[in-house]
Amino acid sequence: MAEWEFAESKPSDELAQLYYFSMKMPQPGGVVEFVITVKEFANPRDHSLKFFASADKQTNQKTVPFTPCGWGESLLKALAECIVAIHKFPYEGN
């Protein structure tokens, strides 16, 4: 357990450490940059959900908007799931 995790006084606080990543996805109109935030929860409700990754932009905006995300027991798993989710649909923003 990392030292910062002991700072959480109540599990309902859902204390999390944040990690930031960026990736670029080529699109017909140019390159779109996504910023992915990964949260590492101090005391997750389920150990397999310790890490949650979420993109800063939605994809598939003109049909059914979708926010790419991923869960996992490791930072790598959550980040990789989010990247796969980004590639599932086209970016249809401005």
Regions found by a protein language model. Name each.
Residues V32-T63:
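A short, structured beta-strand/loop element
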Residues W4, D13, K50-F52, L75-K77:
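Short, intrinsically disordered, low-complexity terminal segments
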Residues M1-E3, H87-N94:
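Short intrinsically disordered terminal tails
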Residues S74-I86:
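Stable alpha-helical structural segments in soluble proteins, enriched in small hydrophobic residues
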Residues A7, P26, T37-F41, S54, ...:
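A structural detector for beta-sheet-dominated domains
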Residues D13, P28-G30, D46, T67-G70, ...:
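Intrinsically disordered, low-complexity segments enriched in proline/serine/threonine
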Residues M1-V35:
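Negatively charged, low-complexity tracts enriched in Asp/Glu with abundant Ser/Thr
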Residues Q58-K77:
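A short, exposed loop/beta-hairpin motif centered on an aromatic-Gly-Thr core
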